Amino acid sequence: VDIESPIDGSLQKAYFYKTRSSKPQPLIVSLHTWSFDYSQYDSINIQSAEKDLNYIHPDFRGPNKSKDACCSDLVISDIDASIDFAIDNANVDTSKIFIIGNSGGGYATIAMFMRSKHRIKKFSSWVPLVDLLRWYDETKIRKLEYANDILSCTQSVNNILNEDVAKKKSPIYWETPIEKLNYTSLDIYTGVYDGMIGNGPIPITHSINFYNKLLNDIGEKDKTKFVSDKEKLFLLEYRKALGNFDSISGREVFLFKESNNIRLTLFDGGHEILKEFAFQQLIK
């Protein structure tokens, strides 16, 4: 389908499935990864169709390598517009709208948690990045292609990162919509080996630091709810479990923390989404 942007009038493509049910059904909004667009293969699509749930996979300015991409105002607006389109064109239970993504899609999922105009029931963000300033340094050191993408996203010149634009496109520097937590939840999942050579490009510190930021912003007083520096260093050094936690999809959970509908899970894995678990947990 084609969806017109309310900001600049450009047409955004999306894959869209609408339920055949006469009863309103949930809407799954699945967000593509960093280097891809709406046409990317998406297992959430198949699982949604099998359950006959409404589903949309928007383009939101395509791969993250242009000034319009990377969680810009246009990106937020495009994803919101895709939700409007689904509501207008399918039998959507608007009390059950879910947003999910991994990697760059996890980044976009967190951006939507922070800034979407819609009332979303649950956000599920897998192996996200949240800080373009830090990620630029991390990818540049490892000579990964993402460093050049970040320069392109931030209107940087002469290979010098435009830090002002990078900050504006990094959810860790945004204001937390505290009131949203009265009706929505955010799950952040990260494979504990992500960020290590051969296991993925996004260090686990992105998820940990964002989780801690949210707890600071909501005024969480219980220090055990935060990920402490000691816990963070233990995970980075040993990559071992910090207690006895449940497993997910047969994977050991190394750390689980929660506060006020915000949950953080670090599991035995790398830069990945555990597809069947992620879908079932989303719609539960």
Task: Tell where the protein language model's regions lie, with residue ranges.
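Structural recognition of the beta-strand scaffold that forms the well-ordered cores
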Residues: L27-L31, N54-D59, F98-I100, K122-V127, ...
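N-terminal cap/lid segment of alpha/beta-hydrolase-fold proteins
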Residues: V1-S22
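Mobile cap/lid helix-loop segments that gate and shape the active-site cleft of serine hydrolases
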Residues: Q40, K121-K122, P128-L129, L133-K180, ...
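Short substrate-entry loop that stabilizes the transition state in hydrolases
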Residues: K23-Q25, S30-D68, M196
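Alpha/beta-hydrolase active-site loop
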Residues: C70-A90
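Primarily recognizes the serine-hydrolase "nucleophile elbow" in alpha/beta-hydrolase
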Residues: F36, I87-N89, T94-K143
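C-terminal catalytic histidine-bearing segment of alpha/beta-hydrolase fold enzymes
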Residues: Y189, G195-G198, T205-K284
